[in-house]
UniProtKB/Swiss-Prot annotation:
InterPro entries: NADH_Q_OxRdtase_chainM/4, NADH_UbQ_OxRdtase, ND/Mrp_TM. It comes from Brassica campestris. Core subunit of the mitochondrial membrane respiratory chain NADH dehydrogenase (Complex I) that is believed to belong to the minimal assembly required for catalysis. Complex I functions in the transfer of electrons from NADH to the respiratory chain. The immediate electron acceptor for the enzyme is believed to be ubiquinone. Its EC number is 7.1.1.2. The gene is ND4. This is NADH-ubiquinone oxidoreductase chain 4. Belongs to the complex I subunit 4 family. The chain crosses the membrane at residues 9-29, 39-59, 89-109, 139-159, 173-193, 214-234, 272-292, 313-333, 335-355, 367-387, 413-433. It comes from the Eukaryota. GO terms for molecular function: NADH dehydrogenase (ubiquinone) activity; ubiquinone binding.
C-alpha cells in the first residue's frame, strides 16, 4: 500500500487529491468553529502549492511528450478514460493555480464568519477542477472540467458578492460560459465519431478534411472565445468582476481566463492547422479591434474593478494575436503573458480590495491623495501599475515583446495596432494611478485609515517577487516550454 501511495504522488495524484480532501474535511466541522475550518483550508492549499514545483524538478524538458501520465477507466465504455498528464506548456499553469488559492483563502480570512466552510469548500473544489483542466489529455475531460469550474464561481459571486446585482452577474457569467460550451461538446462528439476515441493524443494525429476542420474549428472557437474573452462576447467579465468578492476577482483574473487561450493551444491550433491558417486574418482583425476598443473603453470607466477588467480583455486579446502568429516567437511569447496575467490583474484587484475594505467605495472620483495616508499601498500599487503597462523589467514586457515580433513577421498592420494598444494601456494605467494616489485627499468622501497591515503586505510580496523574477530572469520558462512549442509549430506545419 505504501508503494501505491508513493506511486500516486510521483504521478501527481496528490495535486488533485489534496484539495479534494481539504474541501471535504470542513463539512464535518460545525460552523461555529471557524478557526479550524480556516486552518484546514489554508493548510490544504499550502501543501498543494508546496508540492506543485516537484514536477519541475523531475521534468524532462528535452521531450514534447506528456509526462506524469495517469490513466483510469471511469466510464463503462472503451477508449474513454480519465487520462491526465503534463507538458512544458501546462506545467507552470498548474503552479500558478496552486499559488493563487492560498492567497484567495487568506484574503477572505476576516470575511469568512458566515458560510465559512462553504467558502473553503468552494475554493478548494475550484482548485481541484482548475488543476485538472491543465492536466487533461482526454477530450471528454476537456469539456467536463472547464465547464465545471463556473459552478463554484457562480456560488462565490452569488453568495459572497459585494452588491445587490451579484445574482444577475452570477447568472450572466454562468449562461455565457454554458452556451459557448455547447458548441465545444458538439465538436468533441464529431471527433469521437470519426476517431472512435476521446484520447487527445490520438485525435491530434488524425487527419480531418479541410471542410470538417473548418466546422470543428468554428465550434471550438465559439467556446474558447467566450472564455478568453474576445469581443463581442466579453460583456460577462466586467460584470462578474465588479460583483465578485476580492478573492473571487483574484482567482477569476488569474486562472479561468486562461482556459480559452489554453484551449486554442491544446486543441484548435494543433488539431486543425489548415483551418487555423485560414482563420488567422479573422483572429487578427477581431483581436486588434478588441485591444483598441477595450483600451478606449477602459479610459471611460469610473469603477476601479471595471478598469482592471477591461484592461484584462485587452491583454488577453494581445495573447491571441501571438498565439495565431504561426511561429515560435508568437506562440512561445503568448504563454509568458498568460502567466504574467495571472499575477498582475490579480494583484491589482487585491489593491482595490484593500481600498474597498477601508473606504467602502470603488468609484474613482472619490479617491485622491492616498500617497499621504497610505504610502505603503501606494508604492505597491505603483509597482503593479508598471507591470500592467508592460514596462521593461516586468513580467508583462518579457512576454508581450516577443508577441509583437511574431506578429510583425505575419502582419505589420495588426502588430502596429497591438503596439498602439500597449501605448493606450500605459496611458490609462498612469491615469488611474494619478487619480487615486496623487493630488489632494478628499476628506468629504474619504477618512484617514491605516496603511496596509502586515497580513496584507505579506500577501503582496509573493506577487512582487514573481513579477520581478519573470521580468529579470525569465530563462527557466522558455527552457521548459521550447520543446513543446516547437513541436506544436512543426505539427501544424506552420514553419
Amino acid at each position: 500500500m505504501l508503494e501505491h501511495f508513493c506511486e500516486c504522488y510521483s504521478n501527481l495524484s496528490g495535486l488533485i487529491l489534496c484539495p479534494v480532501l481539504g474541501s471535504i474535511t470542513p463539512l464535518f466541522i460545525p460552523n461555529s468553529r471557524i478557526r479550524p475550518i480556516r486552518l484546514i483550508g489554508l493548510c490544504a492549499s499550502l501543501i498543494t502549492f508546496l508540492y506543485s514545483p516537484v514536477p519541475r524538478i523531475q521534468f524532462d524538458s528535452s521531450t514534447a511528450k506528456s509526462q506524469f501520465v495517469e490513466s483510469l477507466r471511469w466510464l463503462p465504455y472503451e477508449n474513454i478514460n480519465f487520462y491526465l498528464g503534463i507538458d512544458g506548456i501546462s506545467l507552470f499553469f498548474v503552479i500558478l493555480t496552486t499559488f493563487l488559492i492560498p492567497i484567495c483563502i487568506s484574503v477572505g480570512w476576516s470575511g469568512m464568519r458566515s458560510y465559512g466552510k462553504e467558502y473553503i469548500t468552494a475554493f478548494l473544489i475550484r482548485e481541484f477542477l482548475m488543476i485538472a483542466v491543465f492536466r487533461m489529455l482526454d477530450l471528454l475531460l476537456f469539456y467536463v472540467f472547464p465547464e465545471s469550474v463556473p459552478i463554484p464561481m457562480f456560488i462565490i459571486i452569488g453568495v459572497w458578492g459585494s452588491r445587490q446585482r451579484k445574482i444577475k452577474a452570477a447568472y450572466q457569467f454562468f449562461l455565457y460560459t454554458l452556451l459557448g460550451s455547447l458548441f465545444m461538446l458538439l465538436a468533441i462528439l464529431l471527433i469521437l465519431f470519426q476517431t472512435g476515441t476521446t484520447d487527445l493524443q490520438i485525435s491530434l494525429t488524425t487527419e480531418f478534411s479541410e471542410r470538417r476542420q473548418i466546422f470543428l474549428w468554428i465550434a471550438s472557437f465559439a467556446s474558447f472565445a467566450v472564455k478568453v474573452p474576445m469581443v463581442p462576447v466579453h460583456i460577462w467579465l466586467p460584470e462578474a468582476h465588479v460583483e465578485a468578492p476580492t478573492a473571487g476577482s483574484v482567482i477569476l483574473a488569474g486562472i479561468p481566463l486562461k482556459f480559452g487561450t489554453h484551449g486554442f493551444l491544446r486543441f484548435s491550433i494543433p488539431m486543425f492547422p489548415e483551418a487555423t491558417l485560414c482563420s488567422t486574418p479573422f483572429i487578427y482583425t477581431l483581436s486588434a479591434i478588441a485591444i483598441i476598443y477595450t483600451s478606449l473603453t477602459t479610459s471611460r470607466q469610473i469603477d476601479l474593478k471595471k478598469i482592471i477588467a477591461y484592461s484584462s480583455v485587452a491583454h488577453m486579446n494581445l495573447v491571441t494575436i501571438g498565439m495565431f502568429s504561426p511561429n515560435i516567437q508568437g506562440i512561445g511569447g503568448s504563454i509568458l503573458p498568460m502567466l504574467s496575467h495571472g499575477l498582475v490583474p490579480s494583484a491589482l484587484f487585491l489593491c482595490v480590495g484593500v481600498l474597498y475594505d477601508r473606504h467602502k467605495t470603488r468609484l474613482v472620483r472619490y479617491y485622491g491623495g492616498l500617497v499621504s495616508t497610505m504610502p505603503n499601498l501606494s508604492t505597491i500599487f505603483f509597482s503593479f501599475t508598471l507591470a500592467n503597462m508592460s514596462s521593461p523589467g516586468t513580467s508583462s514586457f518579457i512576454g508581450e515583446f516577443p508577441i509583437l515580433v511574431g506578429a510583425f513577421q505575419r502582419n505589420s498592420l495588426v502588430a502596429t495596432l497591438a503596439a498602439l494598444g500597449m501605448i493606450l494601456g500605459a496611458a490609462y494605467s498612469l491615469w488611474l494611478y494619478n487619480r487615486v494616489v496623487s493630488g489632494n485627499l478628499k476628506p468629504d468622501f474619504l477618512h484617514k485609515f491605516s496603511d496596509s497591515n502586515g497580513r496584507e503586505v505579506s500577501i503582496f510580496i509573493p506577487f512582487l517577487v514573481g513579477l520581478v523574477r519573470m521580468g529579470v530572469h525569465p530563462k527557466v520558462f522558455p527552457d521548459c516550454m521550447h520543446t513543446s512549442v516547437s513541436n506544436l509549430v512543426q505539427h501544424g506545419k506552420f514553419h
